[in-house]
């Protein structure tokens, strides 16, 4: 029997506000433990929350960008539970009437088809504190308590771990492009829980669901869902009974680990938050927020394909972050060579950034300098290989490529006569290569070209070298 997965994702995104959702404490990441706190976010008696207007605006903005309907009347609710990271013993969130509902994201599958993943709801809530487990005991840091979140709950429309990854990547790119969240998974500002079950292909009845936590990267998400899918299929095939569980992804051992069995009934005893009034959102407010939404990543990617003529794949990669998209567009315009701009950014520049673990915004050179490098190569002033060496220098120093070329004497040798002299010398010293060429071994020419480039320290024009070597070899 063939099975398929039924997957839904719950994504928590910390909002990029300066202050917390119900008080004036800073949302800055880090800091000494329990220094970004006040009576409100600590839940001390007599303290009263006040809803941050910017949080509501960001909730509306996210909803519009994700094709949601905005609930014009919504409210905050108390979610009651006891845990050390929750100082009030309840979380102020939204239950029955969230700020947004019925949205969707479109992802592109491997075969080029588009698939729509439904979004059931988006609701606003406060984050909890953080627990630090030590040998001596467990410590609690409440700096994060009260930091504003939106939780984006997908419908169970996802059928493979790969689709789940594409959904999360698309969601991340949209949220960061509209600047409601920095979406830094390594800092916990974008967190994802997954719900997965399996069912026979063609069936409409979902199986028993597992919730998976601690998936803090795209790779972890895909691996955890794949593992859990295999575990469910194996259990069902053997006739074993699965229980509804919450499990944790163990990255070190590449397995999911049981955290707790889950009660089927909702035991959080939600009820309306009496200290906050019902929220009324006018059409005028929604339209004001709509005007602040920039060109979204998929719209930008489509424009890049049409305007710059780059491949669709390149456009999708370049628009994963707005910083990269902006850097590409400025370079493409200034260099008048969009394909070269795309190749440099997706190739050598991305490699260097990955090696040093830095982002585009932290590069020491700007789009104008990269455009200058591309123009130097296109004009024949330097070769592509020399261009890579110049880029390495730009990456370290931030110097202009022209200055680097002049300082290091890297100008390309386009003098065919001078190159001919080097070629003759190389051929004279390598008679066996000429013999191999005559015997039909075309690669012998490549060997000779390599020797010429080495002799000229990479400064000879490769096109001229190839031409002269071929001409001289054919004379022999």
UniProtKB/Swiss-Prot annotation:
The keyword ATP-binding applies. It holds the Pfam family GatB_N. One of its GO terms (biological process) is glutaminyl-tRNAGln biosynthesis via transamidation. One of its GO terms (molecular function) is ATP binding. It comes from the Bacteria. InterPro entries: Asn/Gln-tRNA_amidoTrfase_suB/E (IPR017959), Asn/Gln-tRNA_Trfase_suB/E_cat (IPR006075), Asn/Gln_amidotransferase (IPR018027), Asn/Gln_tRNA_amidoTrase-B-like (IPR003789), GatB (IPR004413), GatB_C_1 (IPR042114), GatB_Yqey_C_2 (IPR023168), Gln-tRNA_amidoTrfase_suB_CS (IPR017958). Keywords: ATP-binding, Ligase, Nucleotide-binding, Protein biosynthesis. SMART domains: GatB_Yqey. Coiled coil: none annotated. The keyword Ligase applies. It is an enzyme of class 6 (ligase). Its EC number is 6.3.5.-. It catalyses: L-glutamyl-tRNA(Gln) + L-glutamine + ATP + H2O = L-glutaminyl-tRNA(Gln) + L-glutamate + ADP + phosphate + H(+); L-aspartyl-tRNA(Asn) + L-glutamine + ATP + H2O = L-asparaginyl-tRNA(Asn) + L-glutamate + ADP + phosphate + 2 H(+). PANTHER family: GLUTAMYL-TRNA GLN AMIDOTRANSFERASE SUBUNIT B MITOCHONDRIAL AND PROKARYOTIC PET112-RELATED, GLUTAMYL-TRNA(GLN) AMIDOTRANSFERASE SUBUNIT B, MITOCHONDRIAL. Allows the formation of correctly charged Asn-tRNA(Asn) or Gln-tRNA(Gln) through the transamidation of misacylated Asp-tRNA(Asn) or Glu-tRNA(Gln) in organisms which lack either or both of asparaginyl-tRNA or glutaminyl-tRNA synthetases. The reaction takes place in the presence of glutamine and ATP through an activated phospho-Asp-tRNA(Asn) or phospho-Glu-tRNA(Gln). Belongs to the GatB/GatE family. GatB subfamily. Heterotrimer of A, B and C subunits. This is Aspartyl/glutamyl-tRNA(Asn/Gln) amidotransferase subunit B.
């Amino acid at each position: 029997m063939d099975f398929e997965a039924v997957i839904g994702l719950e994504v928590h995104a910390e909002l990029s506000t300066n202050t917390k959702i119900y008080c004036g404490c800073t949302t800055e990441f880090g800091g000494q433990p329990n220094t970004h706190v006040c009576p409100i976010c600590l839940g001390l008696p007599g303290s009263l929350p006040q809803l941050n207007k910017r949080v509501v605006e960001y909730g509306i903005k996210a909803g519009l960008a994700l094709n949601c309907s905005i609930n014009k009347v919504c409210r905050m609710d108390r979610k009651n539970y006891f845990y050390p990271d929750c100082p009030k013993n309840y979380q102020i969130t939204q239950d029955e009437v969230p700020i947004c509902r019925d949205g969707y994201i479109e992802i592109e599958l491997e075969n080029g088809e588009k698939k729509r993943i439904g979004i059931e709801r988006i609701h606003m809530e406060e984050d909890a504190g953080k627990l630090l487990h030590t040998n001596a005991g467990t410590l609690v840091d409440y700096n994060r308590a009260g930091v504003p979140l939106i939780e984006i709950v997908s419908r169970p429309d996802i059928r493979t771990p790969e689709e789940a990854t594409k959904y999360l990547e698309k969601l991340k790119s949209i949220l960061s492009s509209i600047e409601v969240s920095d979406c830094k998974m390594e800092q916990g500002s974008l967190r994802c829980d997954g719900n997965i079950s399996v069912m026979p292909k063609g069936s409409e009845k979902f199986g028993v669901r597992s919730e998976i936590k601690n998936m803090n990267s795209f790779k972890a998400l895909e691996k955890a869902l794949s593992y859990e899918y295999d575990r469910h299929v194996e259990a069902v095939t053997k006739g074993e009974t699965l229980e509804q569980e919450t499990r944790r992804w163990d990255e070190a051992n590449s397995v999911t680990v049981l955290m707790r069995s889950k009660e089927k009934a909702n035991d959080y005893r939600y009820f309306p938050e009496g200290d906050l009034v019902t929220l009324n959102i006018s059409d005028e407010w929604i339209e004001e927020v709509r005007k602040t939404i920039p060109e979204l990543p998929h719209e930008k990617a489509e424009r890049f394909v049409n305007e710059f003529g780059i491949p669709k794949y390149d456009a999708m990669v370049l628009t994963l972050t707005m910083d990269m998209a902006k850097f590409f567009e400025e370079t493409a315009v200034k260099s008048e060579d969009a394909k070269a701009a795309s190749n440099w950014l997706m190739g050598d520049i991305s490699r260097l950034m990955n090696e040093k673990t830095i982002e585009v915004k932290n590069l020491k050179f700007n789009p104008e300098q990269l455009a200058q490098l591309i123009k130097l190569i296109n004009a024949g002033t330097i070769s592509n290989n020399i261009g890579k060496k110049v880029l390495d220098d730009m990456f370290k120093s931030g110097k202009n490529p022209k200055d680097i070329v002049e300082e290091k004497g890297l100008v390309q040798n386009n003098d065919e006569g001078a190159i001919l002299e080097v070629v003759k010398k190389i051929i004279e010293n390598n008679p066996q290569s000429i013999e191999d060429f005559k015997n039909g071994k075309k690669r012998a020419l490549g060997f000779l070209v390599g020797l010429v480039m080495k002799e000229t320290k990479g400064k000879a024009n490769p096109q001229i070298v190839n031409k002269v070597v071929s001409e001289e070899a054919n004379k022999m």
